[in-house]
Amino acid sequence: ILQIEDDEFVKCGAHVCSREEALTKDIICDPKVGDAEYLEQMNEGQTIFGWVHATQNYDITEKIVQHGLSAYAWESMYEKGRHIFWRNNELAGEAAVLHAYQCWGEMPYRTKVAVIGRGNTAGGAIKILHMLGASVRQYSRSTEELFKEELPMFDVVVNCVLWDVKRKDHIITKEDLKHMKKGH
C-alpha cells in the first residue's frame, strides 16, 4: 500500500496476512465497504466496519442482511454532533480536487469553480481550491436553482453532496451539459 513494504507495517505492530486469513476474523475493517467484492465469502455473525453507505447502495445492504453480518457504518458515527471522521472527509475533498486537476492537466488558478455541498468534504475542496487560487462559489440544496442559472460560467463543478436516494432527478441534466463550458 502506498509503496510501503509489509515490514514497515509489522514494525508498527500490524499483523500482515493473506486475504483468506483476514476473512476468517470476527471483525473486518474495510474503509471502502461499498466497493467490497468479498461479502459473499463472509460468514454469519462476522462484523464489518468502514464506509458502508448502505442507504445509497442497496446491493451492499442486501448482501450484509443475506449473510447475517453486522455492519458499523463510519458515515453514521458522530460525537457531540460532529462526525468522528470529519477530517477524513475534508481530506477526501482536498484529494479529489487535486486529482481532478492533475487528470485535467490544468492548474486551479484562473478557473471558476462551483462546489455543491456544505459538509466537510465540500469544506476540504473549497480550502484547497482557495489555496491554489481558484475563484469558488458554494451551493447547497436550497440554492440548486441559482446553481443551474449560474452553471454556464464555471470551468469546474465539484459535487460534494451525499445524494438522497429518494430523488429521481439529477443536479445536472444532459440539457444543462449543453450550456456548460467545453472541456479540453
Please give the residue ranges for each predicted region:
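NAD(P)-binding Rossmann-fold cofactor-contacting core
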Residues: I1-E5, I116, T121, H130-F147
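N-terminal beta-loop-helix "entrance" segment that forms/cooperates
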Residues: I1-H15
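Short acidic low-complexity segments
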Residues: G13-T24, S140-M153
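Short glycine-/small-residue-rich Rossmann-like dinucleotide-binding loops
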Residues: K32-V33, V52-H53, V161-V165
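Glycine/serine-rich phosphate-binding loop and adjoining beta1-alpha1 elements at the start
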Residues: G34-T111
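Rossmann-like adenosine-cofactor binding region
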Residues: S142-H184
